[in-house]
């Protein structure tokens, strides 16, 4: 019993030291980021920094979720969906992704969720503005890895639908993919050269549909901020960026393949999210020797944890 009291004192001292270190860390991050840590939207003891500016534009803001305890082993940079006309960084904490995000936090992986310029944002230059915002967010995150005590060289880019396109556009080209270990694309499109979709869907003609549907034609022109040139189409054809040196791709699409439904109407869910897009991406990965995975091999969180080992 005589050794019990000194042991208790030592444990209390170490506990206080850890608490002080945690407080100092949070204070330093708050000072650097210009925001105050708040309650995590996922609950628990994770540390949450909301609406951090990664640039000066209206929607260049991101949220940071740091796991409780020790330094993070890596980070997932997430881009929300919404057809480039809607959506928010808070979508990362919705029920659809809740289990995945919680699993990552429980395994000491930080989560960063970014907003980006929409096609409805004043002054946008079409989809390229959103893609380049993804690059800006990634560069900002890389510059803060040491501050946030996140292991360098351990980044996964992820997104749903439109956000998956941002993740792929940045993940498949150098130097954007520096330190990126994987790309997680859910409900993904295979290219933002929309004419490439004629190779995805048999019998699909983009120009024919544009002529038949004024609404679709308006969306097309909004997407590119006007009639695109061949060079502008090439700039967003991220499927052609893929090569063997790129990080592994995880792609998961479940929508069907009937672009025109039984009522003779265009099914935008199929057009944007068909499994054919995933197949077209996997075909390119095979052709160039890029590693790829999907739901039949592993879950999204298992993929992230594997590539960040």
What residues fall within each predicted segment?
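Short beta-strand element of the alpha/beta-hydrolase
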Residues: 72-83
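Primarily recognizes the serine-hydrolase "nucleophile elbow" in alpha/beta-hydrolase
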Residues: 139-202
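N-terminal cap/lid segment of alpha/beta-hydrolase-fold proteins
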Residues: 25-70
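Short amphipathic alpha-helix adjacent to the substrate-entry channel of hydrolases
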Residues: 90-112
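C-terminal motif of bacterial Sec signal peptides marking the signal peptidase cleavage site
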Residues: 12-15
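Alpha/beta-hydrolase active-site loop
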Residues: 125-146
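C-terminal catalytic histidine-bearing segment of alpha/beta-hydrolase fold enzymes
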Residues: 249-263, 269, 273-309
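Mobile cap/lid helix-loop segments that gate and shape the active-site cleft of serine hydrolases
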Residues: 41, 194-241, 247
